[in-house]
């Protein structure tokens, strides 16, 4: 009865929420709160502990974020954590904020100032597990009893869904959503959190480790846009979670991007022909090249040209782009925690990638590209091109090559100019559109 009444309350509540249709027009800058910006210049950074980044630091760098054209940020989980758990995924109290990141007033001011600057705020949340406290459940609030958790087992086989949903990730106690009180409490918690702080959207950690039926209820309780982490390269497996949440991160495309820009575009051609059609709504998927769970692109593939092509591709492809902080400054950290390096004193607004990201975001907004489908126009091992509405986007994983695109809808004599580089124009001939690629991608529009 309690759960039924709460769901009815949610349905009757009038909350100002940003829909998935609105979110697909946004471009997201992902921030690890402890590593993006701090307000004190003292102290070194031990990557396994807090380094001093906070909400006030983000506030001070809003112009830096806006300068790249981003109109949404995704920040780390905000709740109280075990000491040294700078990342935010070791929750100890679901009703207290993490004071390492600042006060509640600081957090509210961050959201208020973001909204004044037309920047939406996405908060990372977790409904799967708590801090790794063994069986000392009294250390967790409000889930302070063994009955709130599945029996202790570790995940050894990620292809075994029973283990994925019921066992522990890295020894973190796994919440038991089959317990009505646990589910009711989580639903009320996320609803109240969003209402209290006027949060615009949520990123859901480890979505694949919770039964799908729970996400149907969680989605309704949240009342704002949700995008879930389903860390898997199988398109069918990932796509099924989009039937229970507004969106998921496009991990199959993530692997394809890395393979394509560091290897052969044959992978991307195959993705476009087959994998993308498996998703119920690809226009809402999170598109990314890097994040806090994976080594940075430049660690795997130490080539700034290839990285630049990949980032601009992610901003123009179908879906909601998410750029990981520091990519614009060519951070190249390896495995966790070195992929979460501090950005201190490295806010160069003249870096080539910073400026190209700004131009790509300008193109997104100016041409409303989210209203248009992708049409693949050319694909071989080293060159890839697609049209999306009025734009022709061209990418390379090898510098100094020339290709002629014959599959297009432009007219002979049309003059196309590259919005990423002034003065770079081509004319459509009877033979097609001949593109000469250098280090960087090209985005042409008809003049």
Name each region found by the language model.
Residues 9-16:
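Hydrophobic h-region of N-terminal signal peptides that target proteins for export
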Residues 1-4:
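Positively charged n-region of N-terminal signal peptides that target proteins for export
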Residues 36, 119, 294, 319, ...:
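Generic structural signal for secondary-structure transition and capping sites
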Residues 111, 115, 188-288, 302-305, ...:
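Active-site-proximal helices and loops of the catalytic beta/alpha 8
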Residues 19-27, 32-197, 212-228, 235-237, ...:
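Substrate-binding/active-site clefts of carbohydrate-active enzymes
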Residues 127, 289-296:
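Active-site neighborhood of divalent metal-dependent phosphoester/pyrophosphate hydrolases
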